[in-house]
Swiss-Prot record:
Record flagged with keyword Cell inner membrane: yes
Organism: Nostoc sp. (strain PCC 7120 / SAG 25.82 / UTEX 2576)
InterPro entries recorded: AAA+_ATPase (IPR003593), ABC_transporter-like_ATP-bd (IPR003439), ABC_transporter-like_CS (IPR017871), ABC_transpr_PhnC (IPR012693), MetN_ABC_transporter-like (IPR050086), P-loop_NTPase (IPR027417)
Membrane topology listed for this record: Peripheral membrane protein
Protein name per the record: Phosphonates import ATP-binding protein PhnC 1
E.C. number(s) listed in UniProt: 7.3.2.2
Claim: Cell membrane is one of the keywords in the record: yes
Boundaries of every ABC transporter domain copy: 7-252
Role: Part of the ABC transporter complex PhnCDE involved in phosphonates import. Responsible for energy coupling to the transport system.
Protein location: Cell inner membrane
PANTHER family: AMINO ACID IMPORT ATP-BINDING PROTEIN (PTHR43166), PHOSPHONATES IMPORT ATP-BINDING PROTEIN PHNC (PTHR43166:SF6)
Recorded name of the encoding gene: phnC1
Length: 265
């Protein structure tokens, strides 16, 4: 069976106010892969993720989503909204609306697929609400469906964000430091949930992480950035101490698992 490429980034470069953020980045990620994005703070991880979902537009290079150009040479595809509907995003700060209930936050994932009127008025059908409840059950927090999002713990809020991706119908999940602000147990649950969605539903997952032990435990492949350039793309079993020091350089102290008190190199 032919392999489908979910994400392809070709010669992508971006500068902000004259400072290079990413330079000539190339990577290809197949549908159903689970890939860690690693590197020191400021290495370009978040910038790369934001180009993949079209939030940032590169100065040069091309991003393809399932073989269709999302952006190329500073221009976006005319149907970028449709392409982006295939990409779910979760962030360190969860990006929930605290005053809304959990189920209302999950239903936000449907907005891009609704008519303008239904989107503005947030008119959801019984079927759509049932889908939201099903997603909450799948991530293990259905009992919190009608609580305000602000009442949930950090780990629970991150699972709400994942449920939102499911309701959106995302084929790709981009996770930007999804466990950075979580306690060890919550971090483990979030990572296990992402692995479950990847293995059971074939959702392509790309996650930027600082916690190298998590990378080794949950990912088979890692892409490493240093100063905006790809300097490693391979199996996580190859990430020995020497390679990690090359990737992180003087920022090797970032390999301390935050909040876990464990030095990883």
């Amino acid at each position: 069976m032919a392999t489908t490429v979910a994400i392809e980034v070709s010669n992508l470069s971006k500068s902000f106010k004259g400072k290079t953020a990413i330079k000539n980045v190339y990577c290809s990620i197949n549908e159903g892969e689970m890939v860690a994005l690693i590197g020191a703070s400021g290495s370009g991880k978040s910038t790369l993720l934001r180009h993949i979902n079209g939030l940032h537009i590169g100065d040069a290079g091309t991003v393809y989503i399932f073989g269709t150009v999302l952006q190329s040479k500073g221009k976006v595809h005319s149907k970028i909204t449709s392409l982006r509907s295939q990409i779910g995003c979760i962030f360190q700060q969860f990006n929930l609306v605290n005053r809304l209930t959990v189920i209302e936050n999950v239903l936000v994932g449907k907005l891009a697929r609704l008519s303008i009127l239904r989107s503005i008025l947030r008119l959801f059908s019984k079927e759509e609400k049932a889908q939201a409840l099903s997603a909450l059950e799948r991530v293990g927090i259905i009992e919190h469906a009608y609580k305000r999002a602000s009442k949930l713990s950090g780990g629970q809020q991150q699972r709400v964000a994942i449920a939102r991706c499911l309701v959106q119908g995302a084929k790709i999940i981009l996770a930007d430091e999804p466990i950075a602000s979580l306690d060890p147990e919550s971090a483990r649950k979030v990572m296990e949930l992402l692995v479950q969605l990847n293995r059971q539903s074939g959702i392509t997952v790309v996650a930027s992480l600082h916690q190298i032990q998590m990378v080794r435990s949950y990912f088979d492949r890692a892409i490493a950035l240093r100063d905006g350039e790809v300097m490693f793309d391979g199996a996580t079993v190859e990430l020995d101490d020497k390679k990690l020091n090359e990737i992180y350089g003087t920022a090797a102290e970032e390999l301390v698992m935050r909040g876990h008190g464990e030095l990883l190199v």
